[in-house]
Regions:
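Phosphate- and other anionic-substrate recognition elements at nucleic-acid/protein interfaces
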Residues: 1-167
């Protein structure tokens, strides 16, 4: 049996939905946790509890890519040794793909429902083993973006200066 954990990540909290792939697609638990190491540890404890209770063969933790908010939970789960023994796959998916899947079902939108649809999205075999950027690549990404912004500002300043000289 597989366990799917859908996480709706925001700046302050992680809304989680724990779902199995059995014939009834059981939702084992839905809850909110803080977007902190304590909140991620609580989710980990429930995962370990469910893995013992239901003999989980593999584990998929899926979440939407939400800038920096999803980075820390993704790295926490990906680097955890106990979770890696459960045949773990952490996947960070583009929000527009999950939104299109969710739009098929006409239901109100809230964080708990979003977590359910994220888990369900990964349950129907849509998960891919996404590349979670390592720290070195993130630093390079930030430096590249900063350089790009500085160049744009420099060009804008030069244009402003030239306009003031000739007018």
């Amino acid at each position: 049996m597989k366990l799917f954990v859908g996480l709706d990540v925001s700046s302050e909290k992680l809304d989680a939905c724990f779902m199995t792939d059995d014939s009834t697609c059981s939702v084992l638990k839905e809850a909110s946790y803080g977007n902190s190491q304590l909140g991620a540890s609580q989710i980990k404890e429930y995962i370990l509890e469910f893995s013992q209770k239901f003999e989980i063969e593999s584990l998929v933790i899926g979440m939407e890519a939400t800038s920096l908010y999803s980075f820390h939970p993704a790295m926490f789960f990906k680097e955890d040794l106990e979770l890696n023994q459960l045949n773990l796959m952490v996947s960070v998916e583009q929000p527009n793909k999950i939104k299109k899947y969710r739009d098929i079902f006409e239901e109100n939108k809230n964080d708990q429902i979003d977590a359910f649809y994220i888990a369900d999205y990964f349950r129907i075999q849509r998960q891919v083993n996404s590349i979670i950027k390592e720290e070195e690549y993130l630093a390079l990404q930030h430096l590249t973006r900063t350089r790009y912004q500085l160049i744009k500002q420099l060009v804008r300043t030069k244009q402003h200066f030239i306009e003031n000289i000739y007018y």
